[in-house]
Amino acid sequence: VIVAMGSVTETIKETVDFLAKQGVKVGLLSVHLYRPFSEKYFFDAMPKTVKKIAVLDRTKEPGALGDPLYLDVKALYYGKENAPVIVAGRYGLSSKDTTPEQMIAVYKNLAQPEPKDHFTVGIVDDVTFTSLPLEEEIFAGNEDSKECLFFGLGSDGTVGANKNSIKIIGDKTDMYAQ
């Protein structure tokens, strides 16, 4: 199971769906409210049978024993009998995009008898060699759909431009736009 929060969870959801179609047992626990961090809700959502967890953070805390979400998850399992193996990972450093291939690498790492801890995905770490290896590029989305995600800064025209684009696509093509 991967524990993460933020926009990366959408990529992980696509990856989970892709792997589930192949019969691979993987999961995602998406954190929506980080503080206060709820032990009750975490354990209600986490399967009791989980054996290995990768906690992904999009931050680097120099000098700390681990990144914030990772440390919180580790603390929840501290002293618990039959606690799962918990490893830390970083993604999206240097504003790098996160891809389904990278999430597959995380799940493959978890499948190892001794998963790599404190790994990175999305950058090639040729200094400390913490990067997970990537395999071939995959398409984890729906083959029959086209998806776009636009970000705007507010009052920059993004919303209006996208509404117009969606209207044109819906009116002038045989595609369903929403």
Features from the language model and the residues they span:
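Peripheral docking tails and interdomain loops at the edges
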Residues: 52-141
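Glycine-rich, anion-gripping cofactor-binding loops and their flanking helix/strand elements
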Residues: 9, 13, 21, 28-65, ...
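Solvent-exposed alpha-helices and their adjacent loops that cap or buttress functional pockets
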Residues: 1, 45-48, 80-81, 113, ...
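Anionic-ligand anchoring segments at beta-strand to alpha-helix junctions in alpha/beta enzyme folds, i.e.
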Residues: 3-35, 144-178
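Generic structural "secondary-structure junction" signal
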Residues: 35-39, 121-123, 161
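Short acidic, glycine/serine/threonine-rich loops at helix termini
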Residues: 13-15, 39-41, 64-68, 97-102, ...
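A structural micro-motif
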Residues: 24, 51, 83-84, 175
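Alpha-helical structural signal in soluble globular domains
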Residues: 15-18, 45, 72-80, 168
